[in-house]
Amino acid sequence: MSVDQETVKRVSHLARIALHNDEVELMTKELNVILGFVEQLSEVDVSGVEPLTSVMPMTLRMREDSVTDGDKVADIVANAPVTEENFFLVSKVVE
């Protein structure tokens, strides 16, 4: 796969990036080098290789997933000037 100058112009227009003609030629060359590298990577046989999530083998500590109200109701409603039954009271805005 390769990129031509028209594709670079179209992508730069879509990305709202202004490019001069000499920059279009440079970007075309650079993008083709990058795509060549990606094609090289796709040719590597990785069958049987487990995905690597970390360089160091680690086990994450898990906590029990339980639903709570956080026991923060009093702290939250303390921020409101007027409350009733743990709800914020506000002035009527629309009639």
Curated annotation (Swiss-Prot):
Reaction(s) catalysed (UniProt annotation): L-glutamyl-tRNA(Gln) + L-glutamine + ATP + H2O = L-glutaminyl-tRNA(Gln) + L-glutamate + ADP + phosphate + H(+); L-aspartyl-tRNA(Asn) + L-glutamine + ATP + H2O = L-asparaginyl-tRNA(Asn) + L-glutamate + ADP + phosphate + 2 H(+)
Pfam families for the chain: GatC
Enzyme Commission designation: 6.3.5.-
InterPro entries: Asp/Glu-ADT_sf_sub_c, GatC
Matches recorded under SUPFAM superfamilies: Glu-tRNAGln amidotransferase C subunit
Keywords: ATP-binding, Ligase, Nucleotide-binding, Protein biosynthesis
GO molecular function, one term: ATP binding
GO biological process: glutaminyl-tRNAGln biosynthesis via transamidation; regulation of translational fidelity; translation
Self-association state and partner proteins as the record states: Heterotrimer of A, B and C subunits.
HAMAP family: GatC (MF_00122)
Role noted for this protein: Allows the formation of correctly charged Asn-tRNA(Asn) or Gln-tRNA(Gln) through the transamidation of misacylated Asp-tRNA(Asn) or Glu-tRNA(Gln) in organisms which lack either or both of asparaginyl-tRNA or glutaminyl-tRNA synthetases. The reaction takes place in the presence of glutamine and ATP through an activated phospho-Asp-tRNA(Asn) or phospho-Glu-tRNA(Gln).
Family per similarity comment: Belongs to the GatC family.
Protein name as catalogued: Aspartyl/glutamyl-tRNA(Asn/Gln) amidotransferase subunit C
Organism per entry: Bartonella henselae (strain ATCC 49882 / DSM 28221 / CCUG 30454 / Houston 1)
